[in-house]
């Protein structure tokens, strides 16, 4: 039995990995020695050859998924159902929320520190030996992708569920040559500085994962995106593109209710795509890899979902997406979702505003429930448009008569794409001040989206705590029941303690109202929140 690595050995691997983070974006080369993104992508094939991994990597069976929204959820549905059916799976996703090992799951669980560390150093030493002199070391995400291939080939998985990191055409995951099936989730505007400024251009990049003689399945798309997908499929020999059958069109054995483990109406699109991807996968792999495939295909041919698929769809979990975490403080719940696109924020707003005072969806609630106190804890990355993200929340809260109780809190994330260790020092909150002012303006436009705290004395704002601007108020003096609109809090833990104080105040009043807090805008913020709450992994 292999000796387990120590925590120090694991940390040493993370420190070495940290050195591969360049912070570069897919921009035009700035100097004569800089490579284009296309050239960097082409080098992945050379890396695989020199590592001696080309044959083993291309021998694995892949379900490859690109898209703007719902990639991770779709992959989670696929992974859970395949495992429930008896298939040994490898799941590669990004980004991670708390621990880098979340990106590599085998049979549903993140790989061990020992597995990660041993494979990391094998890859690192091999690249140093064979590639560094003339090619250099691959950058962060490319290194992580090569590491995923190494881990999954060494652990003999039957299927690899592969989520694209960014775009598709030039993404590191696209180095594979013959996936069993490709999927495209809902498309929208995101990473426009890299992928293009129209949905059609973005769709073209996503469709870059289409391969010869490989079926492609897509969720329903807007016409402009669909045209781009169809055009690209027509250019690839033997690539047949179809739209996933709606979830409502599938029957279940005995008519049992079809319940999804992931909350939100939009998850029906992701589950429907997952079903089609698995159906195609079953028909294209060998019986040895999928001994249950013939039986499943027989059921599916009649429009009936196999029983284990129904169970798997209901059991699917995906941390940081539509996740409700009860706090240790009674009557306080955190609603976590890393939404960071306009449409995703609208889905999250509907999910959050649609919960009653018991934390149930209104459709589940049978009795009259005291309306909860709804709070907002938000951050987004500086390349995002805060107005575009916050507008759907303001509109939905107003339309559903589910106002956000003031103040909304804006705090920087401790984690970022630039490092593996959360930042523990004092951060510049100028950006959060700008985002807070955006919310204040939206609150003026959509009067019904915000509710003043019932405990607030009108006009009473603590000295040094102007609304919507950066502040460094000590935790002991920040009381949510005395602030007027938005507030910038320089530390996430301080924000958490302030919310907990608000929940205790509600309880002391005997109002019977639960406190619901929506934490959204960034997967990094959500990951930090899980860490603070002790819910990592």
Predicted regions: what they are:
Residues 147-153, 275-283, 531:
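Short glycine/serine- and small hydrophobic-enriched flexible loop segments
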Residues 242, 436-438, 484-498:
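Short acidic-hydrophobic, aromatic-tinged amphipathic segments that line or gate anion-handling sites
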Residues 28-37, 49-50, 54-60, 84-177, ...:
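ATP-dependent carboxylate-amine ligase catalytic core
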Residues 522:
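Active-site-proximal loop/hinge segments that shape catalytic or ion-binding/gating pockets
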Residues 166-236, 375, 387-388:
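Conserved catalytic-core segment of NTP-binding enzymes
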Residues 1-67, 73-87, 91-92, 132-135:
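Short functional linear segments
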Residues 159-160, 172-183, 187-188, 201, ...:
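Nucleotide phosphate-binding/pyrophosphate-handling subdomain across enzymes
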Residues 219-225, 318, 339-464, 468, ...:
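Active-site beta-alpha connecting loops in nucleotide-dependent enzymes
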């Amino acid at each position: 039995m292999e000796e387990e690595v120590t925590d120090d050995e694991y940390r040493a691997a993370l420190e070495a990995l940290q050195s591969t983070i360049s912070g570069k974006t897919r921009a035009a080369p700035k100097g004569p020695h800089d490579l284009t993104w296309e050239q960097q992508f082409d080098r992945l094939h050379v890396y695989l050859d020199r590592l001696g991994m080309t044959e083993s990597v291309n021998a694995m069976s892949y379900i490859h998924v690109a898209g703007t929204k719902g990639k991770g959820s779709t992959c989670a549905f696929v992974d859970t159902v395949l495992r429930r059916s008896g298939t040994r799976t490898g799941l590669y996703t990004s980004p991670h929320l708390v621990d880098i090992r979340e990106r590599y799951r085998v049979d549903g669980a993140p790989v061990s520190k020992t597995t990660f560390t041993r494979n990391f150093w094998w890859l690192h030493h091999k690249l140093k030996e064979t590639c560094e002199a003339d090619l250099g070391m691959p950058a962060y995400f490319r290194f992580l992708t090569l590491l995923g291939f190494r881990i999954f080939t060494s652990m003999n998985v039957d299927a690899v569920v592969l989520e694209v990191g960014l775009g598709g055409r030039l993404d590191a995951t696209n180095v594979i040559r013959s996936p069993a099936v490709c999927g495209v989730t809902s498309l929208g505007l995101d990473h426009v500085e890299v992928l293009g400024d129209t949905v059609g251009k973005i769709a073209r990049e996503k469709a870059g994962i289409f391969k010869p003689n490989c079926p492609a399945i897509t969720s329903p798309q807007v016409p402009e995106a669909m045209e781009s997908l169809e055009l690209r499929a027509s250019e690839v020999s033997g690539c047949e593109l179809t739209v996933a059958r709606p979830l409502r069109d599938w029957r279940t054995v005995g008519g049992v209710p079809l319940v999804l483990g992931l909350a939100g109406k939009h998850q029906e699109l992701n589950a429907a795509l997952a079903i089609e991807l698995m159906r195609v996968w079953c028909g294209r792999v060998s019986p040895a890899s999928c001994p249950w495939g013939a039986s499943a295909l027989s059921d599916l041919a009649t429009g009936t979902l196999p029983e284990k698929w129904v169970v798997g769809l209901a059991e699917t979990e995906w941390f940081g997406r539509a996740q409700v975490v009860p706090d240790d403080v009674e009557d306080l719940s955190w609603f976590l979702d890393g939404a960071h696109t306009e449409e995703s924020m609208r889905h999250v707003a509907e999910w959050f505003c649609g919960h009653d005072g018991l934390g149930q969806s209104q459709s589940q609630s049978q009795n009259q429930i005291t309306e909860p106190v709804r709070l907002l804890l938000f951050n987004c990355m500086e390349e995002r448009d805060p107005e575009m993200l916050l507008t759907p929340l303001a509109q939905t809260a107003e339309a559903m008569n589910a106002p956000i109780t003031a103040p909304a809190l804006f705090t920087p994330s401790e984690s970022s794409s630039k490092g593996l260790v959360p930042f523990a020092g004092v951060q510049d909150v100028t950006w959060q001040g700008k985002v807070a002012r955006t919310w204040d303006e939206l609150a003026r436009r959509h009067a019904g989206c915000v509710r003043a705290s019932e405990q607030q004395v009108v006009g009473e704002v603590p000295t040094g705590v102007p609304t919507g601007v950066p502040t460094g108020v000590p935790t002991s003096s920040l009381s949510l029941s005395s602030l007027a609109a938005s507030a910038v809090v320089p530390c996430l833990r301080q924000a958490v303690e302030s919310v907990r104080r608000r929940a205790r105040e509600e309880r002391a009043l005997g109002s019977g109202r639960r406190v619901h807090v929506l934490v959204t805008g960034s997967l990094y913020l959500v990951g930090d929140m899980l860490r603070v709450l002790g819910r990592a992994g």
